[in-house]
A protein has these predicted regions:
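Short beta-strand to alpha-helix junction loop
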Residues: 59-66, 98, 121-139, 259-262, ...
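C-terminal catalytic lobe of FAD-dependent flavoproteins
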Residues: 279-392
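Active-site substrate-recognition segment that forms the wall
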Residues: 15-23, 37-47, 52, 81-85, ...
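Short hydrophobic core segments
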Residues: 7, 30, 175-187, 348
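Dinucleotide-binding Rossmann-like beta1-alpha1 core, especially the glycine-rich loop
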Residues: 45-125
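Residues in the short beta-alpha loop(s) of Rossmann-like NAD(P)-binding domains
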Residues: 33
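Helical element adjacent to the flavin cofactor pocket in flavoenzyme catalytic cores
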Residues: 124-163, 168-169, 175, 183, ...
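N-terminal Rossmann-like FAD-binding beta1-loop-alpha1 element of flavoenzymes
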Residues: 2-28
């Protein structure tokens, strides 16, 4: 049985463990902290965040494909994940004219123009789900061959005779595997040996939500399946389980309290409860990692030594581009930028399919757009162009 080590216990690690375990691999997850969930560990619920632009850009395409792919998996080979995903739809607010342009490239079953009960227009995604990270992990941990080790801080990943060796920060060997997935946010880039010139400038942004429980339960406890309300104000996320649970992003919370606006027709007593600032409790603050092109990194780590040796050829051969040297078997899945529920799902499937020699999950253009080597290629081309201007 083939073995994979996944470094990081967040959404990317969870999705990767699921994808490989579904294919019959032995899966070991290494997490530095004492709990699973990564940046969303303190949240009972998160939401899938697809989005469309009028030009149907690469990001839009990737998010829509991720939503469709994971829906098909939950309807088939990954049916055990269904309790963690409640399909309830989502509204991406925008004016009607822009919404009409955005939905033009996609099937009506994927997205359509819609008006909320409050009279706000936008793009409606009927298959969007609210997600329980805890339940997602619980389902994956029940799979045969999946194990987790907490409190393991990885210091490096070395190539071995038959795969890869994972070494902790004290120099101790902790695992050997055929494949290693680096799913540990910015640490993934460091473990791949990449520096800013290789991955571009990184942006870490803080994210906080506010929680309220009318039934007296702890605010960070998953209360069950939620309802993902249409987002009408354009100012963030609204998740609710009527009568017991509410979760709002900080900006929605502030806007709602100041303007006295509600996103649903709750009864007066519930609305009065939610309008009291003391009813809300701030959650833990998580950080989102965003790359400069706002796309994730998904795929094999670049072979930096081989790239340096072939730099001139890689930079100048544009008409018949040479493939970038890669470290097959060492994969990155990071840079989710607040879209982890979708990027993690499609990224894990792309990586597992590649490791197993299966057909590509996405087309070549999308795969290149999220390749961990993409910034290196651009850097080499810029350097070559500058050399031509300055002379030999």
């Amino acid at each position: 049985m083939k073995q994979v080590v996944i470094i990081g216990g967040g959404l990317a690690g969870c999705a990767s463990a699921e994808a490989f375990s579904r294919r019959g691999w032995q899966v070991q997850v290494l997490e530095a902290r004492d709990r699973l969930g990564g940046a969303v560990a303190g949240l009972p619920l998160i939401a899938q965040h697809p989005g469309l632009t009028p030009d149907f850009d690469l990001r839009s395409r990737l998010l829509v494909q991720a939503m469709q792919l994971h829906g098909r998996l939950r309807a088939g080979p990954a049916a055990d994940l269904v309790p963690a995903f409640e399909v309830c739809g989502r509204l991406q607010p925008m004016d009607r004219a822009r919404a009409e342009r955005c939905v033009a490239p996609v099937d009506r079953a994927v997205a359509r123009v819609a008006e909320s009960p409050q009279g706000n227009w936008g793009v409606w995604f009927p298959d969007c789900a609210a997600v329980s990270p805890r339940r997602w992990w619980q389902a994956v941990l029940q799979r045969p061959g999946v194990s987790v080790r907490m409190g393991i801080t990885v210091g490096r990943v070395d190539a071995a005779a038959t795969g890869w060796r994972v070494v902790d920060d004290q120099g101790n060997s902790v695992a050997d595997a055929d494949v290693v997935v680096l799913a540990c946010r910015e640490q993934a880039l460091a473990l791949a040996g990449m520096q800013e010139a290789d991955h571009g400038r990184l942006r870490l942004s803080a994210a906080q939500v506010w929680l309220a429980r009318a039934d007296g339960g702890p605010p960070d406890e998953d209360p069950g399946h939620p309802v993902l309300l249409p987002m009408t104000s354009g100012r963030g996320l609204v998740l609710t389980r009527p009568g017991s649970f509410w979760l709002r992003s900080e900006e929605v919370h502030a806007h709602w309290l100041q303007a006295g606006e509600a996103d649903s027709d709750e009864d007066p007593d519930v609305r009065a409860f939610l309008e009291r600032p003391e009813s809300w409790q701030p959650s833990a603050i998580g950080e989102r990692l965003q790359l400069r092109d706002n796309l994730p990194m998904i795929g094999p780590a670049p072979d930096l030594a081989a790239i340096a040796a072939q730099a001139d050829d890689l930079a100048r051969n544009d008409r018949l581009p040479m493939p970038m040297p890669l470290r097959e078997g060492l994969y990155l899945l990071t840079g989710m930028a607040g879209r982890g529920a979708l990027y993690a799902a499609i990224g894990a499937e792309m990586i597992a399919a590649r490791a197993c020699g299966e057909p590509d999950v996405v087309d070549a253009r999308l795969a290149a757009a999220v390749s961990p080597a993409r910034f290196i290629k651009r850097r080499l081309q810029r350097a070559w162009s500058g050399r031509g201007k300055d002379g030999p």
